[in-house]
Amino acid sequence: MNTFETVIGIEIHIELNTKTKMFSPAPNKFNEKPNTLVHPIDVAYPGTLPRLNKEAVVKAIKLAKALNMEIDTLLRFDRKNYFYPDLPKSFQITQQNFPIGKNGTLTIESNGKKKEILIERIHLEEDTAKQIHLNDKTLVDYNRAGVPLIEIVTKPIISNAEEAANYVDMIRKIVSFIDISDAKMSEGSLRADVNISIRPFGQKFLGEKVEIKNLNSVSNLKKAIEFEKNLQIKKILSNEKIESQTKRFDESKNETVVMRTKSKTIDYKYIPEPNIPFIRIPKDFIDKIKVENLPWNIEKKLLSQNISSEFVQQFLNDFQMLLVFESIIYPNREKLSKVFFSELISLANSKNVHIKDLKFNFSEFVIALKFLDNGEISGKHLKTIINEIFTKNEKVEDIVSRNNLRLISDEDLIFNLINKASKDKNEIILEYPNKPEKVLKYLTGFVMKETEGQANPVLSFNLAKKYLDEKFKKV
């Protein structure tokens, strides 16, 4: 099988998070009651004319900049003509001939090596309605008709499932971080189609390609590519013909399934869209559109704050989580990240909510961290305080006082206890030069026991060490 090369191209459809649809003022929302977000333009009522959504254009320009693309300053649209129940106009408005962005690049990492993915084009278009198959009937929900889409098309340069998965995952992160889409594959706001073919190493022309439609997760994309690659190689070795087909991925069987065979290229009879005039985009308009929060810049910043790579990857996989973390004003980001995941994320998970939806007073949480920094409470107490901030929405000062959580930081009191322990167990103290850890543990433990755990353990340890160092310096 190593004598064959896999060639993959990917088309990604992204639903934009605009307030309204691509060509109508209907709201652009997900999971609403069927056919309640429909404007006459969406269902092609006679006499209606499309009105281009400026917000969608801005988001397309942001993506083009993020992907290092050439931006076409003259907006032009085309009609893609075909008949299907989910297409009320019998044509889709798209940018077949003049995409808003072309010739882009995106660097990914796969198996420890960097690779530049060449992106042929991105273009704006409108989504179709949603078909729902129920028993022997097909229902149509027009809420999705006219939702703004960006399609991202790579050149056939991807070589394996790992590269494909990493590319799609990086696109998902980019569109989330620059706030043009929520990129939730499970909800269909990011959908990937894969074109895959096999050829012997060294062969210049491409083999017959198979398209796998609507892959709804990165893991399924990897499985689909692996299965289809092995299937095509097996057919070649058996002298079977590979047909140009459209397939879907069956999750229950982990295999690709034929939807239809492409006997010939479909002629969509593209024509210029007559109801949307050409629109010139001024250069200063493009220059004012800034692209911030790119994943690689965020990663670099978080790592520079000494946040562990494990936590950084979790932030990169969940932009909403990162936004919550960034909103917490506390200087020690490394310490904050540890408590954020060990306590706050654990709390949110226990309540089955995302951290962004957790009804929690983060200002009081920061005060609790400052109490910890000042030695007023212990790490063990912090968990209790966080839970009571959540359940009772109380102030930290009140929680500490009511539960008697404030640590003893009276140096004279602690020093007297250390001195008492030293006299009571002088034989243990004499072991300090050879067994310093044992003696320090004993003295600190004695102080904690005498104060019923209320002494500041760090202060107790430091005072014990100071006492012992001075004692044995004199000997």
UniProtKB/Swiss-Prot annotation:
Biological-process GO terms, alphabetical: glutaminyl-tRNAGln biosynthesis via transamidation; translation
Gene3D superfamilies, alphabetized: 1.10.10.410
Pfam family, one: GatB_N
SUPFAM superfamilies, alphabetized: GatB/YqeY motif, Glutamine synthetase/guanido kinase
GO molecular function annotation: asparaginyl-tRNA synthase (glutamine-hydrolyzing) activity; ATP binding; glutaminyl-tRNA synthase (glutamine-hydrolyzing) activity
Keyword Nucleotide-binding belongs to the record: yes
EC number(s) from the headed UniProt entry: 6.3.5.-
Catalytic activity, as annotated: L-glutamyl-tRNA(Gln) + L-glutamine + ATP + H2O = L-glutaminyl-tRNA(Gln) + L-glutamate + ADP + phosphate + H(+); L-aspartyl-tRNA(Asn) + L-glutamine + ATP + H2O = L-asparaginyl-tRNA(Asn) + L-glutamate + ADP + phosphate + 2 H(+)
Keyword terms of this UniProt record: ATP-binding, Ligase, Nucleotide-binding, Protein biosynthesis
Known function: Allows the formation of correctly charged Asn-tRNA(Asn) or Gln-tRNA(Gln) through the transamidation of misacylated Asp-tRNA(Asn) or Glu-tRNA(Gln) in organisms which lack either or both of asparaginyl-tRNA or glutaminyl-tRNA synthetases. The reaction takes place in the presence of glutamine and ATP through an activated phospho-Asp-tRNA(Asn) or phospho-Glu-tRNA(Gln).
Family according to the record: Belongs to the GatB/GatE family. GatB subfamily.
Assembly description: Heterotrimer of A, B and C subunits.
Name the UniProt record assigns to this protein: Aspartyl/glutamyl-tRNA(Asn/Gln) amidotransferase subunit B
Species in which this protein is naturally found: Mycoplasma mobile (strain ATCC 43663 / 163K / NCTC 11711)
Gene: gatB
